Amino acid sequence: MSESYQKLRKDFKDLDFTDRLTFLAESVLLTGQSAIVGGLEVAGSVVETVAGTVGSLVDASGIGNMLGGSGGVVGETIDRVAITVKDVSRSAGDLYNDAVRNVENVTGNAAKAVGDAGSSASDAVKNIAGSFQKTTGKK
């Protein structure tokens, strides 16, 4: 194993239990974000070879039904990009890349929010644990 991995492992083991949980939660969210963004970039490259305009992009990929109908962040972002684009001659790949950047911003903010929530949760767990130790320590 590499030195950097060994250092990361040691640092992780030195963390409090609640800090470990926070770290793992943030890692899961960021990994999910990377998968979503990577998937959209690949899809954008593939669709660009098939469709050249906003209308044909939506028709060829079924994005309007698949993502737009879900009411999710990705669907809403793609809908907004498609509606607000003035120059229909822009390539489908450019539209996808704009959508990907917007999704990255949203998920990045979500990661920060989870980090903040994790810190609050960590503090709350520490306070409860401290109270529990004080209560059980009295006889």
Curated annotation (Swiss-Prot):
Give the superkingdom in one word.
Bacteria
Instruction: Give this protein's Gene Ontology molecular function annotations.
Output: bacteriochlorophyll binding
User: What Gene Ontology cellular component terms go with this record?
Assistant: chlorosome
Tell me what this protein is called: Chlorosome protein C
Keyword entries, A-Z: Bacteriochlorophyll, Chlorophyll, Chlorosome, Chromophore, Photosynthesis
Keyword Transcription regulation part of the UniProt annotation: no
- Pfam families cross-referenced by the UniProt entry: Chlorosome_CsmC
**Location relative to the cell:** Chlorosome
* Organism, as annotated: Prosthecochloris vibrioformis (Chlorobium vibrioforme)
Keyword Endoplasmic reticulum carried by entry: no
Q: Extract the coiled-coil ranges from the record.
A: none
| InterPro entries referenced in this protein's UniProt entry, alphabetically | Chlorosome_envelope_CsmC
Q: Name one GO biological process term.
A: photosynthesis
